[in-house]
């Protein structure tokens, strides 16, 4: 029986597909912002399963919702009603201000669902001729890895060697309002699918007016704005949604401040909606869009199952009751300001950017270099887990439950790692 980290890594290499390149650490336990490897060493988790663990590892209320429901009724399919789905649907639609929600499992499934909704609306409501609807997307996007989604990816790692590709998508530069305006001149455009902050691209934060201006343009052209908030939503950027802007969400409730909030026609959620314990995703829209899909035209055996619904309700309640978006804002400021003071002047550092607790450090080296990877190995040795993205960028996104003192300790460790690393160059 395998016991050491090496044993477990060897098992994965022998029996698992080689579609990931994990940091060499084998985890077996987590609590709050901390995780432990099989040898018992503790680490600060600064990835949060790509922002799926916003409420912290093993939150007792969320785990309790999972266990209690699993003991009672786990799965019915949607062939029958269940007693948890309706209450969840009411809670999430009221939370974010939409008429309807369609529950799915993974983020990629939710994006696929949004694409189908947009196309169906385009044909039934907007009147675009059959099979001619187009959806605008952005360069450097990441919305998943299904065959449809990779068809509009600009990342060769995602799409190369997996054609033929699905037609009906047009890419424009991110954060480019004039390019969007020009693309929207095509009467066959049905939707604009966009990340309010591009996470996988390296935490690219657009101009503050980008999403709101995009919404205005979409409305003027009768085009649906589809916000992919799978990674940015549920408090990660310091508000319930990144499209809330800097509204504040001071009470822990989604206040939808009309001066800052941009309302997407289709809202896509996932990751932290699960509380980090069970796959849950959701697509929200009003009746004019959602009710274009009828029975038999879309569905999922596990989507909206009793466990998922119960877990998601608990995950949302924890966010509100503990006002975690407020902590994300405070600790995010602490992270960026503290790191800039400590390492901002190093030649190794090209920049520090982000919003809330979704942040990135840009390493002053080429994307093809191993510098960011080597830094993550050094951070691991210092008890901090993070992962490079796009070669020379390190993303830092701890659970939103991280305390001020924990952040301070993590910053001190990071300062030591980056400073010592530069001295070896």
Feature map (PLM): residue ranges:
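Conserved N-terminal phosphate-binding loop of PLP-dependent enzymes in the Aspartate aminotransferase
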Residues: 2-425
């Amino acid at each position: 029986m395998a016991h050491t980290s090496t044993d477990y890594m060897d098992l994965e290499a022998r029996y698992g597909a080689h579609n990931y390149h994990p940091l060499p650490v084998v985890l077996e336990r987590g609590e709050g912002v901390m995780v432990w490897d099989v040898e018992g060493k503790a680490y600060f988790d600064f990835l949060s399963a790509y922002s799926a663990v916003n409420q912290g590892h093993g939150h007792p209320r969320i785990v309790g919702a999972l266990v209690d429901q699993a003991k009672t009724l786990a799965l019915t399919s949607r062939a029958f009603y269940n007693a948890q789905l309706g209450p969840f649907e009411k809670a999430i639609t009221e939370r974010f201000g939409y008429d309807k929600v369609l529950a799915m499992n993974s983020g990629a499934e939710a994006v696929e669902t949004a694409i189908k909704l947009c196309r169906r609306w385009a044909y039934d409501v907007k009147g675009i001729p059959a099979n001619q609807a187009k959806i605008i997307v952005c360069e450097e996007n990441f919305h998943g890895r299904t065959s449809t989604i990779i068809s509009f990816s600009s990342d060769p790692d995602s799409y190369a060697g997996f054609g033929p590709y699905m037609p009906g998508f047009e890419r424009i530069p991110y954060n480019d309002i004039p390019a969007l305006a020009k693309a929207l001149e095509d009467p066959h455009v049905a939707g604009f699918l966009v990340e309010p902050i591009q996470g996988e691209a390296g935490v690219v934060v657009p101009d503050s007016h980008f999403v709101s201006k995009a919404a205005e343009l979409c409305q003027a052209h009768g085009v649906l704005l589809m916000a992919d908030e799978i990674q940015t939503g549920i408090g990660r950027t310091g508000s319930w949604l990144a499209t809330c802007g800097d509204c504040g969400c001071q009470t822990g409730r989604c206040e939808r401040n009309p001066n800052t909030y941009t309302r997407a026609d289709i809202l896509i959620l996932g990751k932290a909606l699960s509380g980090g314990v069970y796959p849950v995703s959701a697509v929200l829209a009003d009746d004019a869009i959602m009710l274009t899909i009828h029975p038999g035209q879309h569905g999922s055996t596990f989507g909206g199952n009793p466990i998922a619904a119960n877990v998601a309700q608990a995950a949302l309640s924890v966010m509100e009751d503990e006002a975690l978006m407020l902590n994300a804002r405070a600790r995010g400021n602490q992270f960026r300001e503290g790191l800039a003071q400590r390492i901002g002047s190093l030649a190794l550092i090209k920049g520090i950017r982000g919003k809330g607790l979704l942040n990135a450090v840009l390493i002053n080296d080429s994307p093809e270099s191993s510098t960011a990877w080597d830094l993550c190995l050094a951070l691991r040795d210092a008890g901090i887990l993070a992962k490079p993205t796009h070669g020379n960028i390190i993303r830092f996104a701890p659970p939103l439950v991280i305390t001020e003192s924990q952040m301070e300790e993590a910053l001190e460790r990071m300062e030591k790692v980056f400073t010592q690393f530069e001295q070896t160059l």
